[in-house]
């Protein structure tokens, strides 16, 4: 176990919850940071994040990034159009890109980590994100890792432990770590239940199927 502390960028979804428990296993201490940026599903995912962190007794800070919802354009945001239904791929999900979202969040997380004396920031991106979101790709992670390391004088490093894993592999790891997936939230629509039709719901279903795990999610359809 690493004797240092880690800060996990935590949305309350499958990947970041697995990252949270992975960090708890790998580091002496772990905290979570969540961001409210005006997404349609922010209220649902942050409610999930709160429940999960309270259950695990992990400290969590919530930081508002209201300017994103006010000035940026994306169907993921409350100010944007409808969330596309269907496959989780580049063509279908292009409208859900929020410009440089992860860069903004990671910059804030890195500053918070340095100020708190933490040695690492952890992001739970995976291979399925690469084609859709430029700020989830390995080259972006490498660039941000260099920027964070340089900008904090080597005090903070960026870790992306799942960057070369599929969501199904993450689900399998999460099950090994004891993740209660029934508490996690994925759906971009942010209604009472997972819609079951948007790309993230489709990807969620596929991940459980790939991992050979029962899907505990309650879907609308």
Question: What residues fall within each predicted segment?
Answer:
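Immediate flanking context of iron-sulfur cluster ligation sites
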Residues: 175-196
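ATP-dependent adenylation/nucleotidyltransferase module used to activate substrates
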Residues: 1-178
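Iron-sulfur (Fe-S) cluster-binding segments and ferredoxin-like electron-carrier domains
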Residues: 132, 190-193, 199-221
């Amino acid at each position: 176990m690493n004797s240092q502390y880690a800060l996990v960028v935590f949305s309350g979804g499958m990947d970041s919850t697995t990252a949270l428990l992975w960090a708890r296993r790998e580091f002496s201490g772990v905290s979570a940071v969540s961001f409210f940026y005006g997404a349609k599903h922010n209220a649902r995912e942050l409610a999930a994040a709160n429940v999960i962190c309270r259950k695990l007794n992990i400290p969590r800070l919530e930081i508002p990034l209201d300017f994103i919802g006010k000035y940026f354009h994306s169907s993921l945001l409350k100010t944007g159009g409808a969330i596309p239904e269907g496959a989780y791929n580049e063509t279908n999900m292009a409208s859900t890109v929020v410009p440089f979202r992860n860069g903004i969040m990671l910059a804030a997380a890195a500053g918070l980590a340095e100020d708190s004396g933490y040695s690492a920031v952890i992001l739970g991106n995976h291979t399925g994100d690469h084609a859709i979101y430029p700020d989830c790709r390995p080259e972006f992670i490498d660039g941000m890792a260099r920027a964070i390391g340089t900008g904090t004088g080597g005090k903070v490093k960026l870790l992306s432990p799942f960057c070369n894993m599929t969501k199904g592999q993450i689900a399998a790891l999460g099950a090994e770590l004891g993740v209660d997936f029934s508490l996690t939230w994925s759906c971009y629509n942010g209604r009472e239940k997972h819609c079951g039709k948007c790309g993230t719901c489709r990807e969620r279903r596929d991940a459980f199927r790939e991992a050979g795990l029962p899907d505990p999610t309650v879907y609308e359809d």
